[in-house]
Amino acid sequence: GDESATFKVDKIKHNNIEIWIQYPHRKHSQYNKLALGVPQHLSNNLPQYQDKSYDVSFAGQITHQRRQELSKAMPTIANSFYEPTEGFAQGLNPKSYYDKMFISKIIPCPSGQVVIDSFRFYETIEMLCLPIADNIDSKGNTMNYYNFLFEEEVPVKTIDNWNLLQTLVPELLSDYPNNMHQIVCWWIKYKRNLFIELMRQINA
C-alpha cells in the first residue's frame, strides 16, 4: 500500500473514473476513501466462541511514540493481557492472536506506522471487541482520522493520551456490551453500504 501517500494520484486523468484511496491523507479529501479492513488470513483463523475473560488486551509492535506511550499504560491495567513485540508479525501467530483478542472486551488501537488506520481497529470489531481509536498519529499530528475516513461520526471512543487508559477503561466497561454492539452494528452497515456504492459506480 501507499501509506506514505507518495503516489501522485492527482496526475490520473480520465473522463469516466472513480478513484478510491486506502490510507488516505488530508490531501485526498476529494476522493473515495477505503478503510484498510482486516487481513486475508483472519477468515482462516476464526476462534471458537468463548466468554470474554480479559477486560483489555494488546499484542503488537512498540515502534513509535504512540505505541511507546501505550506500552507504559498497559501494565497498569487490571485483568489485561499485554504482549509487546519488536516488529510486525513477530509476536503471536495469527490463531493465538485472534484467540486472545476474542476473549477480550476492549482493544487499544494505537496509530499505524504513518496514518492512524490499522488492521487492529477492524480486527477488534470483527472479534466482537470494543476498540479505542487513536487521535494522534505516529508523528504527533492530531486528527479524528476515522471520522475523516468514513465521512461520518463513527461511534468509537478516541484518545489523545494513552496514559489516561486506566481511567478510561472503567468508563467503557460500565456501558459494555452496549457500546460494543453499537460499533459492530455500525461496521456491518458500513460494509453493506460500501458494496452498494461500488455496484452503483460500476453500473453508472
Predicted regions and their residues:
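Conserved donor-nucleotide binding/catalytic region of nucleotide-linked donor-dependent transferases
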Residues: 164-186
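Residues at or immediately preceding the N-termini of alpha-helices
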Residues: 94, 162-165
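Nucleotide-sugar donor-binding catalytic core of glycosyltransferases
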Residues: 1-154, 158, 185-203
